Amino acid sequence: MSLLSFLLGEKKKTASVAKERLQIILAHERSGRGGSRPDYLEALQRELVAVISKYVSIKPEDIKVHLQKQDNLEVLEVKLELPEAARG
């Protein structure tokens, strides 16, 4: 948008706005964050198991790490199944 367009109050055409949005979506998907599971989640899950194992006896399959998108946020969800003795 040029300075003259800005001062005169010209609005962008719908097609150009849609094109810009599509370019942003494509760039996001190409960066590896659109829909695929990030590489660090596996390492994060292993480290969580190691830290929690210091205090509670758990197995690696007792912890689940999931990343999901909600609106403009990325939510990291960690589910942990504690053994009966630890629930106390």
Curated annotation (Swiss-Prot):
Pfam families linked to this entry: MinE
Q: Which residues fall in a coiled-coil region?
A: none
Q: Name one GO biological process term.
A: cell division
- The reply to whether Chaperone figures as a keyword in the UniProt entry is no
Keywords from the named record? Cell cycle, Cell division
Does the keyword field hold Cell cycle?
A: yes
Family assignment from sequence similarity: Belongs to the MinE family.
What HAMAP family does UniProt report for this protein, alphabetically? MinE
Q: What does this protein do?
A: Prevents the cell division inhibition by proteins MinC and MinD at internal division sites while permitting inhibition at polar sites. This ensures cell division at the proper site by restricting the formation of a division septum at the midpoint of the long axis of the cell.
* Protein known as: Cell division topological specificity factor
Q: Which organism is it from?
A: Methylibium petroleiphilum (strain ATCC BAA-1232 / LMG 22953 / PM1)
